[in-house]
């Protein structure tokens, strides 16, 4: 019997088949005529996609029926649900920018013009010059190396 296959371009191919032929056989015949590999072909008849192992008789395809040929789509992942968070996002710490911050470490005497250090500089070799120690109420502390000097406690 003769069936028609309408391609994507609108071109109609005629194929000579038997009702006992499988969909695989039909796809092989389409490959011979059009050069499209069978694994990329999808045949549709009466709104249903035809499975490879079944025969034309299974789908009630009779003489002069028209099958529609479409190409297989590649890829496409599952759509994911949007995450819902229980806690709000933590606000990032904003760095406080202080202009001329080094002025708080030194004092200039108005009369003599002499510069004196207000903070103690860390003597540790790994810190290097210019690393000042933090003034706490009972100690000096270096934030870089962890060196601590505790003030003398008067009893």
Curated annotation (Swiss-Prot):
Query: Gene3D superfamilies, from UniProt?
Result: 6.20.50.150, Phosphatidylinositol 3-kinase Catalytic Subunit, Chain A, domain 1 (3.10.20.90)
Q: Which organism is it from?
A: Zea mays
Looking at the UniProt record for this protein, which Gene Ontology cellular component terms does it annotate, in alphabetical order?
A: cytoplasm; nucleus; ribonucleoprotein complex; ribosome
GO process annotations (BP):
modification-dependent protein catabolic process; protein ubiquitination; translation
Question: Residues in domain Ubiquitin-like?
Answer: 1-76
In its miscellaneous comment, the UniProt entry states: Ubiquitin is generally synthesized as a polyubiquitin precursor with tandem head to tail repeats. Often, there are one to three additional amino acids after the last repeat, removed in the mature protein. Alternatively, ubiquitin extension protein is synthesized as a single copy of ubiquitin fused to a ribosomal protein (either eL40 or eS31) or to an ubiquitin-related protein (either RUB1 or RUB2). Following translation, extension protein is cleaved from ubiquitin.
Q: Which SMART domains match?
A: Ribosomal_S27, UBQ
Q: Does the keyword Nucleus apply?
A: yes
GO terms of molecular function: mRNA binding; protein tag activity; structural constituent of ribosome; ubiquitin protein ligase binding; zinc ion binding
Q: Which UniProt keywords apply?
A: Cytoplasm, Isopeptide bond, Metal-binding, Nucleus, Ribonucleoprotein, Ribosomal protein, Ubl conjugation, Zinc, Zinc-finger
Q: Which CDD domains match?
A: Ubl_ubiquitin (cd01803)
The name this protein carries in UniProt is Ubiquitin-ribosomal protein eS31 fusion protein
Matching PROSITE patterns = UBIQUITIN_1 (PS00299), UBIQUITIN_2 (PS50053)
Q: What is the lineage of its organism?
A: Eukaryota, Viridiplantae, Streptophyta, Embryophyta, Tracheophyta
- In terms of superkingdom, the source organism counts as Eukaryota
The UniProt entry, under InterPro entries, shows: Ribosomal_eS31 (IPR002906), Ribosomal_eS31_euk-type_sf (IPR038582), Ribosomal_zn-bd (IPR011332), Ubiquitin-like_dom (IPR000626), Ubiquitin-like_domsf (IPR029071), Ubiquitin_CS (IPR019954), Ubiquitin_dom (IPR019956), Ubiquitin_ubiquitin-like (IPR050158)
Q: Could you say which protein family the record assigns here?
A: In the N-terminal section; belongs to the ubiquitin family.
| Keyword presence, Ubl conjugation | yes
Q: Cross-link Glycyl lysine isopeptide (Gly-Lys) (interchain with K-? in acceptor proteins) maps to which residues of the chain?
A: 76
